[in-house]
Amino acid sequence: MKFGVTLSNRGVLVGLCTTSDLLKLADAVEASPLMDSVWCGDALFVNRRLDALTLLAAVAGRTERVLLGPACMGSFGLRDPMVFAYEWASLDVISNGRTRLVACAGGGAGPLWEAETAAMGINPDDRRKHMVENMHVLRHLWTKDNAPFEGRFVKFSNITLEPKPIQNPCPIWLATNAERLSTGQADSGGSEFALTRVGKIADGWMTHSVSPGGFRRSWDFILKVGSDQGRDMSGFDHVLYHHINVNGDKDAALADSKTFLDLYYTANYSKERLEAWLTYGTPRDCIEHLQRYKAAGCNRVTFRISTMGDPMTQLKRVTEEVLPFV
């Protein structure tokens, strides 16, 4: 398996860490032979945090090896795709071709989400449609010069974007989940359509809060969709977005993670919700839990270090006591 760390860029706003802490954590990932990627969350006006693009650019400037991406780009459907295409292409150049863009629709229920969407001039019902069209805009600008584009929301002609990304094609993954929505509620039927979209148009897949069995079923479904479309899925990649807390006392590990995640997301997570999103307990507990995902075909995991303690100390335990034995 391959492993990465998801930086807690919202933590800077809620007093859980400093910007320096995040960059030191990225340095530690770069230095670890067991890890190969650095990720960070993304949102605009709900679940506010340091801007993902800016933070990833900062990490790119001090690393040479690790892959870089959002987990996931929740604001993707809200951003101007022409400007974003330019920004992401620049990040790919700065990082020497190490980016993994993970698009997702983002959003949720409630007045704050509605206000965010309205402020960006987008109909909430069209958020996913914007996401898909934005993917097409990015690919168009990254691979063509002076070619017209005629979409539902975006239209242009005689536009050439430079710099182009170093990667050709520059990968765009999609984030979706077959078992839970981002709110943690049981999915009501849209997941099969979302997984079909991954298999048809994405270059990779990110998921979270999914059981090993659910991961296997979703992964097989995506690969079949892609193959049925005539796509070569041999290089199609994925990542499980997860949390981890290593502690000799399993109950203490769960309590520590709950305190962290409740503060981080301004929530009150149930034990069931936490256990869907978290590897925790003794090193042996964590090893066995991750081995179940490995047996289900999961070959890449990115962890948020979910502790109220020192994340560097926790990362040391993860890399020394858990990952070598998975």
What are these regions (language model features)?
Residues 27-32, 56-65, 88-99, 197-200, ...:
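Acidic (Asp/Glu)-rich catalytic clusters
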Residues 50-73, 130-134, 316-326:
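Alpha-helix-loop-beta-strand connector modules within alpha/beta enzyme cores
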Residues 3, 59, 91, 138, ...:
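Conserved, mostly hydrophobic/aromatic
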Residues 1-67, 125, 168-171, 181-188:
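N-terminal beta1-alpha1-beta2 module of alpha/beta enzyme domains
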Residues 3-7, 36-40, 68-71, 99-103, ...:
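Hydrophobic faces of well-ordered beta-strands that scaffold small-molecule active sites
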Residues 37-62, 74-75, 107, 209-215, ...:
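Glycine-rich, proline-tolerant flexible connector loops at the mouths of alpha/beta enzymes
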